[in-house]
Amino acid sequence: MRFLLDAEQRAFADSLNALLTAADTPPVIRAWATGDRTPGRALWSRLADAGVFALAVPEAYEGVGPLPAELAVAFIELGRHGVPGPLVETVAAAVLLSELGESGSAKRLLPALASGEALATVALPGGGPFVLDAEAADIHLTVDSPEAPTRDTTPPARLHLSGSGSGPTGSARPSLDPARHLTLPHPTGELLATGPHVTHAAAQALTWARLATAAQSLGVGLALLDRTVEYVKQRTQFGVPIGSFQAVKHQLADAKIALEFARPLLFGAALSMAPADVAAAKVAAGEAAYATARTALQLHGAIGYTAEYDLSLWLTKARALRTAWGSPAECRAEVLTVHGPRSTDSAVSGGDPRS
């Protein structure tokens, strides 16, 4: 099966690429990392005008979705240009509110997410212990459970809503990517819903978050590869470009193959939206981007990891996205629940828990 974009999807990708190229994102990323949100919010509004956030919002709430394939197209471009902010989290929040089946909360919050008026951050079971950019978000959603799960029962989940300035306030956790600000979630504020439907909605939101992260990772990897190819054409050694050396060509070819193998997995997952398919796509894209980052750093040499050099903005993001919304080991475990051996012992022995 071939997963090729149609003309409309290609035009959408081209328009986003042109928008983000004109925006010159490296200064925006650096400003966001220092806490200056003004350039980032301005770019966020332009992305919303292009329809990016409306892709996860149903038409009934002023969106155009749900359109997971188009969302994947958009997030590849967002990753390619390193756009900062709670992009994935806003999508996950939109899906969470849409899947709840509670029209009151959806009508109140979803139009603002679709239009870009509001940024959201969200904490979900299975999504990791931290929330992203809580201090910049206007909407904070936290799903938790009042009881610990047992072997035979899953307690009902609760969804809490808090607004700007009243969300997670715990001490920040340093991230390898300076543009990602992490804090611990605190389930406080208005109780929007409780019950099994919250658990279901949270699972759907997690799947969308992993899909968007996979697409973002693929875009980051493609950007790293493109920048490295250009660099090895210019950097000379022994009087010739280092890109002419066979060893360099092989490393770049390996990176290209890994990224292109991840692409059909991503779009296949966007068509099925099966949790195991999405988890497989996230592993493939995340590992391909991380491997490309290592190759890019090696071929650039010392200049590659200097903070002043733009390549570092993508190097750190590739590493951070690799474990965001599910580590490689967690995503592989998700795949094994459907496609792996029946035995838990066999499943555990089949993967590296350190990955």
Model segments located where?
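Alpha-helical interface subdomain recognition
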Residues: 1-79, 207-355
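Short beta-strands and strand-loop turn motifs
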Residues: 55-57, 88-91, 121-123, 147, ...
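Generic beta-strand or strand-like secondary-structure segments
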Residues: 73, 77, 92-96, 108
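Alpha-helix C-terminal capping segments
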Residues: 78, 82, 97, 122-123, ...
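N-terminal glycine-rich flavin-associated loop
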Residues: 85-102
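FAD-binding core of flavoproteins
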Residues: 95, 103-226, 346-355
